[in-house]
């Protein structure tokens, strides 16, 4: 730990030393840039507009008169950017050689403009591989949540809006991978949406597929989104895979009423941004959505209420802040159709969440502290889940086991099915604080923008946890799960520090070197027995070889800390029959006794952060006519993802019969002599340990081709796609019990094994996909209308669940000792005590070793035939009053009958569920 801290301090010292020792600028060599920002046409001042000078990273905000200034700017040429919600971003090159006073006019966003952007735009070379999606693209897409916006990213498959199913972020991954979903980061207005406080209990696995639900974020309150697929800035952490940065609306906007309707969804919103003298700018948004899985049956539904209230204001001339309060209420439900008989079975989940975010920016103007930014965030959630279903009795009687401690228990039983309800009450909370110091330097032809900062997070869960509505009728009877109090689990602290240098070097007028070099240090529960530490160096590079060709690449490390569920797994329960005496002529003497074994799963002291190494290499080509081509190859490897760890312990479980142990009295109760069992079984049981046992490798090639505009048709053409491969496997050995066919009858009858066989694990799952997307966007400014047609082809959809043919390499005996099985032992025999014999002995039950091999014959890759989808969208502005949008997905209703895959001749209907249509109408008041 001390070495790690020393390394971090040294890194920060070197960054600061680099800044201090850089050639000093004289006061005369630094200038002020003063801005006056107004609306084009009305010349009204634009308040709280964000102004930045790149690549120096100097950022400021306009005041009540629309004025802003940036001081101490070294001489040189910079790119000035001015942005505000509802306006086109202003971008211009500014040559600074003296004090400047600039007048900037912002143009309101409108379809009457010559250029309309309704697609995702690639980020500049030399920074993280990412796509930016603006408000116009979100409106044209008619997105209902953040999940819908993701389909604009290269390689993503076009799908219908479906709010009835949980939507998680899976970038560059072709399967619902646990670590990928858990390691995706969603940052809203500077505060990450943490899922570290999620806990499980009952029948749920602590390694279940988890991730932030994208349905929670309504699309109508979003101003813009940045989706980072590559190596992120060192400013962002606690992630392994993708990063999505969401900026909500902030600024003066008219009253806007929106409504979107399709057969499965109704979504309405109301929003307004207004300014109060001396109080700042206020923003209000309310969103309601209701969705059904199938409107004909309505067996699944989802309802969402989102409300936000924000304020932007200035404490002083140099201190600007934004505060936003959000409320979310969401309800998932599935059950019987309203027209069907209501048998009482259903599932519902309610989520009520309040979040408060506060972002501030102080223009300090010092050499080593140009701008000080800070973020504070607090989220309190209440998630209640109710599961109600019938528990069936299939074997005459069903034991009702509720024991929470190890021992022998006389249990009641049910003889007929009953309706049971299981309830989970979760109360996760998350606090976040962050501070960043930004400053810049210029020396000759080089410019450097530095970021140095730290953040802190605290996550907890104070919920009641899982419990049964009626303990005499448990939801999962005779099951491993038992009630669990989430409030018993302690919270977790996380600290991080980071430093980053964005470097630009103009070697000449053509050749430019850009780099983003950063280091991030993350620690969880520092100095405690659960402490984890991780260093995450990150580098993005680009070099302009010619005016039309850029080479770029990068390598970086991401790190995800384990959440509460991984650090504090639930107890393990195992229940075995100890006595089952059911005399027909003596009801009073009937007795059912179970032995319950409880294993107190230790907290995960050996668990490490899941880390992903990202490597990228690509080219950016600028072609005549504003055409552009980007090609990127990537490889993301996570060698230590979270998963179950195979670890055993053994225990004794006694069985009592009338021959030994049970004392039956005619007409009276039956009692047990626990010291006189008829049989004592030695049972293997897993401990429930969590480890870094999963490895995932994602690799592929992405491309994005802007083919420019066909001017006579006013149509822009965009062609993108990706070839992706995901391979995932378990790094642990495989283990299993001895097959019952090679054991005496009493072993299989009593469900025990003499030892556990161990095999090398060569199994893996591999997925491949090759997808192309062609978009035609036609803009007609005179009609205030834009139309787009999107065609997508999935050329390859490949899946291979490989199971290797392997022989045992060892076994774990009843003393939990591992004993090897070498190659020259495969033709021998093992007795029930694990003793090896080269020749089969007489009079001893033995197991032929070669028969214990795992042999498979059906591990064949599955390949599906290509399918395609064609969708159309139209957006029309109705002057300044409002607008109308229409869309049709799978507009040719292409649902062919094709072979399911290459391994079968059965025809199945493909591309089903993709046909949809809808309309959106909005009014500006």
Set out the residue ranges of the language-model regions.
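Short, acidic, small-residue-rich periplasmic hinge/interaction motif at the N-terminus
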Residues: 30, 36-42, 47-54, 83-85, ...
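N-terminal periplasmic "start-of-domain" segments of outer-membrane beta-barrel proteins
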Residues: 50-54, 58-67, 115-144, 165-170, ...
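Short acidic/polar hinge/loop motifs at secondary-structure boundaries
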Residues: 71, 191-228
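C-terminal beta-signal and adjacent terminal beta-strands/loops
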Residues: 792-853, 864-866, 874-925
């Amino acid at each position: 730990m001390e070495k790690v801290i020393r390394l971090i301090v040294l890194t920060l010292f070197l960054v600061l030393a680099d800044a201090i020792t850089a050639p000093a600028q004289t006061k005369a060599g630094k200038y002020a840039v003063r801005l006056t920002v107004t609306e084009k046409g009305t010349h009204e001042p634009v308040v709280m507009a964000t102004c930045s000078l790149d690549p120096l990273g100097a950022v400021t905000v306009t005041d009540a008169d629309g004025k802003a200034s940036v001081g101490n700017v070294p001489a040189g040429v910079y790119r000035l950017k001015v942005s505000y919600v509802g306006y086109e971003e202003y971008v211009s090159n500014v040559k600074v050689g003296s004090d400047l006073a600039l007048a900037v006019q912002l143009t309101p966003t409108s379809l009457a403009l010559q250029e309309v952007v309704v697609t995702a735009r690639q980020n500049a070379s030399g920074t993280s591989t990412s796509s930016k999606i603006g408000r116009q693209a979100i409106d044209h897409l008619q997105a209902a949540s953040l999940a819908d916006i993701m389909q604009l990213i290269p390689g993503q498959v076009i799908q219908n809006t479906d709010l009835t199913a949980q939507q998680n972020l899976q970038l560059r991954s072709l399967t619902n991978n646990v670590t990928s979903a858990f390691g995706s980061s969603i940052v809203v207005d500077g505060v990450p949406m943490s899922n570290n406080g999620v806990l499980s209990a009952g029948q749920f696995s602590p390694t279940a597929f988890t991730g932030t639900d994208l349905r929670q974020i309504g699309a109508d309150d979003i101003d813009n989104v940045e989706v980072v697929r590559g190596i992120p800035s060192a400013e962002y952490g606690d992630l392994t895979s993708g990063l999505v940065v969401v900026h909500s609306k902030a600024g003066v906007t008219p009253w806007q009423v929106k409504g979107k309707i399709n057969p499965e969804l109704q979504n309405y919103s109301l929003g307004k941004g207004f300014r109060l003298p001396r109080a700042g700018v206020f923003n209000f948004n309310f969103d309601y959505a209701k969705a059904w899985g199938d409107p004909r049956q309505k067996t699944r539904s989802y309802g969402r209420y989102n409300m936000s209230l924000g304020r932007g204001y200035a404490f002083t001339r140099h201190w600007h802040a934004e505060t936003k309060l959000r409320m979310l209420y969401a309800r998932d439900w599935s059950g019987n159709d309203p027209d069907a008989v209501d048998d009482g079975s259903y599932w519902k989940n309610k989520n009520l969440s309040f979040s408060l975010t506060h972002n501030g920016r102080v223009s300090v103007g010092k050499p080593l502290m140009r701008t000080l930014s800070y973020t504070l965030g607090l989220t309190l959630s209440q998630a209640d889940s109710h599961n109600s279903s019938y528990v069936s009795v299939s074997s005459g009687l069903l034991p009702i086991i509720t024991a929470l401690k190890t021992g022998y228990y006389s249990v009641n039983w049910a003889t007929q099915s009953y309706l049971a309800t299981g309830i989970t009450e979760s109360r996760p909370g998350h606090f976040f604080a962050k501070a960043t110091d930004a400053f810049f330097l210029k020396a000759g032809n080089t410019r450097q923008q530095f970021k140095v900062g730290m953040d802190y997070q605290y996550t907890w869960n104070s919920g009641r946890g899982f419990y049964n509505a009626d303990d005499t009728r448990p939801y999962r009877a005779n099951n491993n799960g038992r009630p669990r109090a989430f409030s018993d689990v302690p919270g977790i602290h996380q600290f991080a520090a980071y430093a980053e240098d964005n470097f630009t070097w103009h070697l000449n007028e053509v050749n430019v070197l850009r780099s983003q070099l950063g280091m991030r240090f993350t620690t969880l529960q520092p100095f405690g027995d659960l402490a984890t530490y991780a260093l995450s160096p990150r580098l993005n590079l680009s070099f302009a070889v010619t005016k039309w060709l850029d080479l770029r690449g990068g390598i970086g490390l991401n790190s995800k800390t384990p959440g509460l569920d991984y650090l504090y797994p639930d107890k393990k329960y195992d229940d075995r029959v100890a006595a089952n005496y059911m005399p027909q002529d003596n009801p009073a003497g009937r007795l059912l006794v179970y032995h319950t074994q409880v294993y107190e799963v230790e907290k995960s002291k050996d668990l490490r952060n899941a880390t992903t190494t990202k490597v990228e290499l690509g080219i950016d080509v600028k072609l005549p006519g504003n055409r552009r081509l980007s090609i990127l190859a990537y490889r993301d490897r996570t060698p230590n993802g979270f998963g179950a760890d195979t670890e055993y312990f053994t225990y004794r479980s006694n069985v009592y019969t009338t021959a030994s142990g049970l004392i039956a009295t005619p007409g009276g109760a039956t009692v047990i002599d626990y010291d006189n069992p008829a049989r004592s079984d030695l049972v293997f049981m897993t401990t429930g340990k969590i480890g870094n046992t999963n490895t995932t490798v994602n690799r592929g090639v992405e491309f994005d081709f802007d083919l420019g505009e066909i001017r006579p048709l006013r149509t822009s053409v965009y062609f993108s796609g990706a070839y992706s491969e995901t391979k995932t496997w378990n790094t642990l050995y495989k283990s299993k019990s001895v097959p019952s066919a090679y054991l005496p009858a009493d072993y299989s009858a009593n469900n025990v094994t003499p030892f556990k066989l161990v095999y090398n694990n060569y199994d893996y799952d591999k997925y491949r996909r090759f997808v192309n997307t062609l978009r035609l966007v036609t803009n007609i400014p005179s009609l205030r209308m834009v139309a787009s047609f999107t065609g997508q082809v999935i050329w390859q959809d490949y899946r291979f669940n490989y199971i290797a043919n392997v022989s045992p390499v060892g076994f774990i005996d009843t003393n939990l000792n591992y004993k090897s099985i070498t190659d020259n032992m495969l033709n021998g025999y093992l007795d029930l005590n694990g003793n090896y014999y080269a020749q089969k002995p007489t009079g001893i039950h033995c197991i032929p070793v070669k028969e214990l091999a795992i042999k498979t014959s059906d591990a064949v890759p599955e390949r599906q035939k290509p399918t395609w989808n064609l969708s159309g969208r139209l957006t029309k502005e109705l002057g300044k009053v409002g607008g109308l949008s229409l869309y049709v997905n799978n507009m040719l209703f292409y649902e062919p009958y094709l072979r399911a895959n290459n391994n079968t001749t059965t025809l199945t209907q493909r591309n089903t569920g993709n046909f949809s249509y809808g309309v959106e109408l909005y009014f500006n008041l």
